[in-house]
Amino acid sequence: MSDILNKIIAVKREEITDAINRKPLPAMRKDAESRVLTRDFVGALRAKIAAGKPAVIAEIKKASPSKGVLRADFIPADIAQSYAEFGAACLSVLTDQQFFQGSIDYLKQARASCSLPVLRKDFIIDAYQVYESRVMGADCILLIAACLDDAQMKTLEALAMSLDMAVLVEVHDEAELERALKLRTPLIGINNRNLNTFEVSLDTTLRLMGKVPAERLLVTESGITTPEDVKRMRDARVNAFLVGEAFMRADEPGVALAELFGE
C-alpha cells in the first residue's frame, strides 16, 4: 500500500474501534438486517447504457487530500437533486471525515432527497463498516483492492451481497484487476489516479479494459474533466463513469454534468 493509504487505514481502524464502543457489532448487525428495499445500483447503470447514454455515478465530495476543499457551499441534498435532474444514473457520497471532510449524514441527506441509488465512498476494511453502510442507507459499497487481501475482499463482498447491496471493486493496475475478477460483482472500477503520486492518466483505463470480460460492467474513475475525455472513453466503449471534482467546483453540479456528457 502507498503511504497515504497506510495512513488512512490506520485511522479507519481507530474509527471502527470507536464506533463499536458506541454501538456494538450485534446491534449494528441487527439494524442492518432489518433494513429493506435497496435501490438497484447495477440496474440503474445498465439501463442508461442500454438506452445508449453514458452511465454517470455523480460524486458528492466536499474535499480531497490532494486538492483541499472543493466546494464551500456544500448542501448534499441540493447537489443530489441537481444530479438527478440532469441525468445521473447513481450517486457516490464520500463518508470519510478526516481526509475528505465527508459524513454519514451527507449520504443520508443525499439519498433522502432523490430516488437515485447511492454508493458509499469510503475505505471499507471491516465487516462492521458493511453493516453500518446498510444502516445508513447505502445501496452499494466500494472495496479498494489496494487496501484488502483476497480473503478480505471475498468476505466483505459476500456480506454486502447478503444485505442486498452492490459492490464496486476498485483497481489501479493489472495485478489488482486479476484479483478483482475473482469476485462475483459485475462492477469493476478502474481508478486513473496513481495513489502513490496522485497523477492521473486515462491511459490506465484504456490499458486495462481489454482484460475485463464483456459481462462485467467497467467504470472509469478520476480524470474525466472535458467532453474530449468522455469521447475518448466512449469511442473505446467505456460507458460508465464516476466523476466528482469536475462537478463540485461548478455553480450548478447537474448542469456541469449535462455539459460534460453532452446530455
Curated annotation (Swiss-Prot):
So where does this one cross the membrane? none
One Pfam family per UniProt: IGPS
Show the GO MF annotations: indole-3-glycerol-phosphate synthase activity; phosphoribosylanthranilate isomerase activity
Q: In which pathway does it act?
A: Amino-acid biosynthesis; L-tryptophan biosynthesis; L-tryptophan from chorismate: step 4/5
Q: Record's PROSITE patterns?
A: IGPS
Enumerate the UniProt keywords alphabetically: Amino-acid biosynthesis, Aromatic amino acid biosynthesis, Decarboxylase, Lyase, Tryptophan biosynthesis
E.C. number, please? 4.1.1.48
The catalytic activity, as recorded, is: 1-(2-carboxyphenylamino)-1-deoxy-D-ribulose 5-phosphate + H(+) = (1S,2R)-1-C-(indol-3-yl)glycerol 3-phosphate + CO2 + H2O
Can you tell which superkingdom this protein's organism belongs to?
Bacteria
- EC top class, in one word? lyase
Q: Which GO terms describe its biological process?
A: L-tryptophan biosynthetic process
Please give the family membership noted in the entry: Belongs to the TrpC family.
Q: What HAMAP family does the record point to?
A: IGPS_B
Enumerate the NCBIfam families for this protein: PRK00278.1-2, PRK00278.1-6, PRK00278.2-4
Can you name this protein? Indole-3-glycerol phosphate synthase
Q: Which gene is transcribed and translated to give this protein?
A: trpC
